[in-house]
Structure formats: structure tokens, C-alpha cells
């Protein structure tokens, strides 16, 4: 089952701008190695970034959003610039696509993120993208004491295509030969190279477990700054 691009969970970043810069940096030489590099950028930036979710309190039907807790105006119903992946109580036997994240009931301000990277030093990984599985997690029986997870293995190629669909949908890009698009790509190619070089320390990963916590915004971390971002997760 393909991932719905609208269910990619993001927080405090302009993912469209990031993906745009990634694609810009690959514009002139889109080889197999570059495909993997592009994918690693997307994966690490998605899954090492704070998730946004909505929870339900035990004794109330009202939903409390973590975005409200981090906002100067709690309860503000205005649309957000970020995609949100909503986690809520469902029927015991229902299933929910979990967008590569594992939600912990034991600490409702914490999400355990499984980071699936590709070790760029292992040349054998680049022989065939079908040999490198990406695990997509689902959770079932959300009301039970212990979560049960179903793992769906998809190919690297499939995930790349899903990321491209997300990119195309959110940038309204017409086609690769569009003159204005090419001009825009050339005009900020330097920025694309910068973000690739800045994020490169994050990519030499195999499988990493990471826990991200929601806090009151006092972390003073700029998640749009790749240098500062890498200092956190390296």
C-alpha cells in the first residue's frame, strides 16, 4: 500500500523548500547514486524532525493538539503551513498507517522514530534498489496495553516515487522542461549544494532508533537550519 503524501508528518520546517533544494542539487547528474542520496536526505529530514500529532484526553471528547501547546495562541483553528499526521483513539480492531513512526502511550509527549537510512560506505547497497528494504510500520489495537506492529517492506524505488509525488503536488511543478523552473533551479543551485554538504554528516546511517520529545518551544533550535539540525541528530 502506497503512502499518502498528505500524511507525511512535519513540524517547524518548510519541507517544500527543502525538497526543492535537494532536487536542485541533483539536477545536472541524476545517477543511481544521486537517487540514493536524494532519498537519504528526505528520510533523515522527515524522521528526525519533530512530529505533530493530536491526542484525546481520557475523560473528554475534546482533542488537544500538541501544536496548540507550542503556540502563543492555544486553540487557534487557523490552517497550519505544515502537514499534520493525526493520531487519535480508534476502534480496537482498526488499523492506521503510522507514517514510519511509533507512538508511545506511556509518554504521550514522546514519539519513538525508527530511522531507516542507507550506509553510503557500503557499495553493495547501490547494486539494486530492490535489495534495500524500507520498512513502513502500522499499528493495530490502539486501545490495548501493548501495541502490535505490522511491518510493510517497500522498495527504495517506491519510496523515491512517493517523495516525488509529494514534491510535485506541493510545488505545482509542471514539467522538467519548463523554462521558468529551469531558471529557478539554476538561480539557487548554490543553496542546494550548501544544504547537501551541510546534511551529509547525517547520512552515514544504517538503522537508528531515536526519541524526539515535545517541549514548550524553549529549545531555541532552528529546524530549518541544516547545520544546527545536524548538530542535534549526529
Curated annotation (Swiss-Prot):
It comes from the Viruses. Residues 67-79 have a biased composition (Polar residues). Residues 62-99 are annotated as: Disordered. This is Uncharacterized protein L199. It comes from Acanthamoeba polyphaga mimivirus.
Amino acid at each position: 500500500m502506497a503512502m499518502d503524501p498528505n500524511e507525511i508528518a512535519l513540524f517547524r520546517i518548510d519541507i517544500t523548500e527543502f525538497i526543492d533544494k535537494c532536487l536542485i542539487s541533483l539536477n545536472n547528474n541524476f545517477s543511481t547514486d544521486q537517487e540514493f542520496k536524494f532519498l537519504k536526505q528526505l528520510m533523515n529530514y522527515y524522521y528526525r524532525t519533530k512530529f505533530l500529532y493530536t491526542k484525546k484526553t481520557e475523560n473528554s471528547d475534546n482533542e488537544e493538539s500538541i501544536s496548540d501547546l507550542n503556540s502563543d495562541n492555544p486553540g487557534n483553528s487557523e490552517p497550519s503551513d505544515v502537514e499534520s499526521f493525526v493520531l487519535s483513539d480508534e476502534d480496537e480492531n482498526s488499523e492506521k498507517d503510522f507514517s514510519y513512526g511509533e507512538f508511545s502511550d506511556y509518554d504521550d509527549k514522546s514519539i519513538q522514530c525508527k530511522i531507516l537510512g542507507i550506509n553510503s560506505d557500503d557499495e553493495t547497497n547501490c547494486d539494486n534498489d530492490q535489495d534495500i528494504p524500507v520498512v513502513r510500520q502500522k499499528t493495530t489495537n490502539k486501545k490495548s496495553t501493548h501495541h502490535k506492529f505490522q511491518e510493510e517492506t517497500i522498495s527504495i524505488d517506491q519510496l523515491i516515487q512517493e517523495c516525488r509525488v509529494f514534491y510535485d503536488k506541493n510545488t505545482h511543478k509542471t514539467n522538467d522542461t519548463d523554462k521558468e523552473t529551469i531558471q529557478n533551479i539554476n538561480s539557487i543551485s548554490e543553496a542546494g549544494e550548501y544544504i547537501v554538504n551541510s546534511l551529509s554528516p547525517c547520512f552515514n546511517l544504517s538503522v537508528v532508533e531515536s526519541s524526539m520529545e515535545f517541549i514548550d518551544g524553549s529549545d531555541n533550535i532552528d529546524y530549518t537550519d541544516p547545520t544546527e539540525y545536524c548538530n542535534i541528530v549526529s
